[in-house]
Regions:
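Active-site acidic catalytic loop and adjacent metal/ATP-binding pocket
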Residues: 30-40, 44-45, 163-202
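ATP-binding pocket architecture of kinase catalytic cores
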Residues: 23-131, 136, 146-154, 171
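A short acidic/basic microdomain associated with nuclease active sites
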Residues: 17-23
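A generic local structural motif
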Residues: 9, 20, 30-31, 61-63, ...
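Short amphipathic alpha-helical segments, especially helix-boundary/capping motifs
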Residues: 7-10, 38-42, 51, 86-91, ...
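Hydrophobic, well-ordered secondary-structure segments
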Residues: 106, 110-113, 159, 178, ...
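Short small/polar-residue motifs
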Residues: 19, 73-75, 185
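An alpha-helical support segment within catalytic cores of ATP-dependent transferases
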Residues: 2-17, 121-179, 189
Length: 202
């Protein structure tokens, strides 16, 4: 869906009034998202839908996002269908790549992780995907090899490392997790941290 197609779709929704301006968010690796502004409000619009090659199921992302909102750490889902997700806009700054490594920031992120494991999971209402992390990694490596990636030779050691960690942690408790603490998925409004992009949670 290009920008003009997206704008046309948004104009059919009761959410927006007047002219709509779209600003593309740079730097996200697995999705396209826009800041959508009309005459009165701002929203974040994410191009959604199922993306099998990423293991993304739209209905799960919606439910996980709603659970995150109920737990107080994610923006509200305003609208969703099979092709787009619209979220409340949070006036905030992204955590930078350097900033995410700072000690105080890491403490705040650990607090977020605890909320996910102890609170967000209790607000899930729809089917909850079980993400088997190590198997997901192996599946993606298989896909990349089938597509003749130039990095195939480097995967062997990576697979061995995964198997080592898998053996080490196979007896640990399984908990609900966000699974994508990419620095652009963490927002700081000056008072607290917010999490977005629950597409690979489980």
């Amino acid at each position: 869906m290009n920008t003009e197609q997206l704008k046309t779709k948004l104009q059919t929704l009761d959410i927006f009034s007047g002219s709509i301006d779209l600003k593309f968010f740079e730097g996200f690796m697995s999705n396209d998202s826009y800041l959508a502004s009309d005459d009165n409000n701002k929203y974040v619009v994410k191009i959604g839908g199922n993306r099998e090659h990423y293991g993304v199921v739209n209905s799960h992302e919606v439910e996980a996002s709603k659970a995150g909102y109920r737990a107080g750490i994610s923006p509200k889902v305003i609208y969703n269908d099979d092709s787009i997700l619209i979220f409340q806009y949070i006036d905030s700054n992204e955590i930078t790549f350097e900033g995410i490594r700072e000690k105080e920031t890491l403490k705040r992120i650990v607090s977020l992780i605890k909320i996910i494991q102890k609170k967000v999971v209790n607000y899930l209402e729809g089917p909850n995907l079980s993400i088997e992390l190590f198997q997901t990694i192996k599946n993606k490596i298989t896909i990349l090899k089938e597509r003749n990636t130039p990095y195939a030779d480097k995967f062997n050691n990576f697979v061995k490392d995964c198997e080592l960690f898998e053996r080490k942690y196979e007896s640990h408790e399984i908990v609900f997790a966000h699974n994508d603490f990419y620095f652009k998925n963490i927002l700081d409004d000056g008072k607290k941290l917010w999490l977005v992009d629950w597409e690979v949670s489980g």
